[in-house]
Structures are given as C-alpha cells and as structure tokens.
Amino acid sequence: METNTMSQQEENQQIAARKVKLEALREAGVNPYPSGFKPDIDLASVSRANGNEMDPATLERVSVKVAGRIMLLRNFGKLTFATLQDESGRLQISAQRDVVGAELYSTVFRKIEVGDILGVEGHLFRTKVGELTVQVERFELLSKAVRPLPEKFHGLEDVETRYRQRYVDLIVNTEVREIFKTRSRVISRIRQFMEHRGFLEVETPMMHPIPGGATARPFVTHHNALDTDLYLRIAPELYLKRLIVGGFERVFEINRNFRNEGLSPRHNPEFTMMEFYQAYTDYRELMDFTEALVQDVVKDVNEGELTVAYQGQELDFSGPWARLTPAEAIVRYMEADAARITERGYLESLAESLGIKAETSWDDGMLLLTIFEEGVEHKLMAPTFIIDYPISVSPLSRRSDDNPDIAERFELFIAGREIANAFSELNDPADQASRFQKQVEAKDAGNEEAMHFDADYIRALEYGMPPTGGEGIGIDRLVMLLTDAANIREVLLFPQMKREG
C-alpha cells in the first residue's frame, strides 16, 4: 500500500526489514501468530475504572491483562513505552528490561514494531505527567505485522485507498470506526421501533426470476442447474406484498438491494433499505409513522437532540414536517407561475431553463417530475414530504379517489436527497396489470429501467390484498445524515470500487 508520505520503494524496504525480524523471531523459537491469549478487560475500561483520584499505592495493586495493536512506540534502551489500541480505545504500556527479563526483552520485545498486536499482563501506575500506564510483567506477541501502517502524523488520507483498504482505514482513523458503530446503532434502533409496533421481520429472495418493485436496471446472473437467468433484486416490494396477501399484516425487511447503475456520492450499486408494509393504512398515516420513526432514531444516536449538524448546516428534525406536491414545490423553490404549472408549454419552458430537453415520449407527469428532480430536489434541506405524484411515474401506487391522475404517494427529502419512498399500495389486479403492460411497452421502446410484467404478482392480487401502505427507507442515506458524511462510500464498509490496475 502506498501512503501519502511513503513511496512504494520505502514501503517495500520496510516490508523486507519486518520479514527479517519475523524470521529472527521464529529462529528464536517464538511463534509470531499464537492463539490462546485472553484479555480480561478492554483498554477503555481500564482507564474508566482507575481514575486520577486513585492513589499510587492502590493503583499499583491493580493487575490487568490486556491486548491491542501497537500504535506508538518509543524505545529508550532498557525501557520501552508503547501505546496499545483495541476497539474500545488506547492505553500506554511500559516495558523494562529488568522486569520482563533481559533475554526476552532483547530477542522479542525489541523486535516489536508499530502495527504488531501484543498481549500484556502487569500492574498499573501513572507516569510523571500523569498518564495511566501498564507496567509490563509478562507479554506475548500475538500477531506480527509485515506491512507498515501509514505514518504517525499523516495518517491515511487518500480516499481511494481508504475505501479500497478499509481495514487500514479502520485501524488508523478512529472516527471512521465511530461512523460504523453509529450505523449499527441506527439499524438496531429501527428494528426495535418496528418490532415494538407489531411488525414481523422477514427475509425474501435476493435472486428474482423477474426483476420488479422499482424502476431500475438489474444485475443479471445465471442459475446453471435450472439453466435460467435470475436477477439480483432491485427491491423486495412485490414479495413483501405477497405476504400481505397471505395474511401477514405488518412486515418489514432490512437488507440489500442491487441496481446496475452508476456510482456517485449518493449512489452505490449495492445498498441497504428498510422496506415495510402495513395492512389497513394509507400513505398519509405512513407520513406520521415515518416522522416518528426518523425522530426516534435521531434522538437515539444524537443524545436526545433533534437538531443535527450536517455539512455546515443545521437540520431540524422536530415536526411537523412540510408537505408539498411536486407542483407546489416547483412554484415555491423555482418561483414558477402557479396559474400555469399545469400547461405543457410552460412546463417545457421550465425544463428548457434547466437545460432539460423534453423527450417526445414524456407525458406531463414525467416532465413535471424531471423538472422537480433537477430544479428543486437539491434545495430541500429541512425534512420535507413531497406528496401526490403523477400516476404515470408511480406504477405500483394506488390512484387517488379524488383525482385519478394522482398517486397516493410521497417521498421524504432531507438535505437535498431522497430518504424514503412510500405509497398507498395498488391492490386492483386489473389496474396493476394495465400499468405493468405500459411498463413493458416502455421497455420495448428502449427504457431499460422500465418494469417487467409479473404475472404471478397479478395472480396474488387476484386473491385479494387488503388496503395497504408500504414504504422503503434508505439506510445508507439516513446514516450519512447522522454521521455528517458527504459521500455514501463513507458509510459503507466496503463500497464498490473500480478494479485495481
């Protein structure tokens, strides 16, 4: 690995020198990769349990058995100081030749380097500057590192290297570990919220015979035994709604979706969604539910506060959140003429002002949505529900009883990006079949993201699905908001990258 401050040649030289030490240890009868060492306490707990108020005599009676990776190392001949790091934090150790034994000190301890993993036993004391330290009485090398870590004061800063070699990033950048602890906490809190409200967590297929549930290009694979193509799922929606047909009234799933699309600060081909469906509710009740869910998660990870600092701005999650139609949002944020917002010619002029050339295949709904996406979406910083989408761009959503051209649908936007998408579900099998057919026609006309016709799903609807509300929430984007991450790859442990070389 080439770091910011170390050339490939320098790194190769260090690797060679470390391998020489590794062989010297083996020749001395030392196993550089043993097993069996069991720490009895983590490093942060040592510090918490032994505060500044403890007198030196009492402190010296405290014995600990700890392990960690060496992050700092200072040799002073017969005395060595090192800083160990484990998942919980850091702690200094001190090894003296006269205490651990001259032979062990010279043949083993002096061959230990930054990056090595060490287990030690000893008692506690404080240095002259007051730093809590373990006086090493016994030690064991647990893992010899043959690659050097990035230099102490420069760290690992190159983003490509950080994402590609996340294991190094996690070692040297403690704030990165905190991001993924927060991510885990967010998912755990969502799961608790759903379970406490009677939702059943389920698992649906990751490989689909027919891609569906969203408009996106799928990844294609092949099942050799069945000699058939399968598709990595772009959404679990149609399977989850089959469960509603089957009698489960509240279901949710937290899992991966896959979409064969481009990479961007907001998009990764593999991403995590929480999708849920509830019988006997609609999209308006889901807005209240979503507001409560997100607020609960924000307070849990933000020390009870509903204000979050994100990329230099303060996001206020306290309610009630704004609710606007796409047309109302265009009027508000683009200063468009409300009296003309339904005119085709006026919409085309708005699109042209944004550099958008309307395609002849676009109906007014698609044109309106494109104007919203290009001209408004990035301006929606405070949590905002965009509601009542055109039915033509919502092929799985129920029509409004008041206006058949409108879908009972909303999307939640925060910090200029979509966080959730929800609707009152379409449960009329004939209407759904008609919309599937229009999607097939769009696909035949060249729209690679249009949906396929799923005859089995139509068959399921023909058995009767109760009135249902459903929603998908982007976990990755929600975590971005709560960790002040500008790029989705910051919140994915192993984001998709171009192949090296």
Curated annotation (Swiss-Prot):
GO CC term (a single one): cytosol
Enzyme class: ligase
Residues that bind Mg(2+) 1: E411, E418
Cellular localization per UniProt: Cytoplasm
GO molecular function annotation: ATP binding; lysine-tRNA ligase activity; magnesium ion binding; tRNA binding
Database matches in Gene3D superfamilies: Bira Bifunctional Protein, Domain 2, Nucleic acid-binding proteins
Coiled coil: none
Single GO biological process annotation from the record: lysyl-tRNA aminoacylation
Reaction it catalyzes: tRNA(Lys) + L-lysine + ATP = L-lysyl-tRNA(Lys) + AMP + diphosphate
Cofactor note: Binds 3 Mg(2+) ions per subunit.
Predominant location category: cytoplasm
Cofactor(s) demanded: Mg(2+)
Transmembrane parts of this sequence: none
Binding-site residues for Mg(2+) 2, renumbered to this chain: E418
Entry EC number(s): 6.1.1.6
Signal peptide: none
Keyword list, A-Z: Aminoacyl-tRNA synthetase, ATP-binding, Cytoplasm, Ligase, Magnesium, Metal-binding, Nucleotide-binding, Protein biosynthesis
HAMAP family in alphabetical order: Lys_tRNA_synth_class2
Family membership noted in the UniProt record: Belongs to the class-II aminoacyl-tRNA synthetase family.
Subunit structure: Homodimer.
Protein name: Lysine--tRNA ligase
Species of the source: Magnetococcus marinus (strain ATCC BAA-1437 / JCM 17883 / MC-1)
Gene that this polypeptide is encoded by: lysS
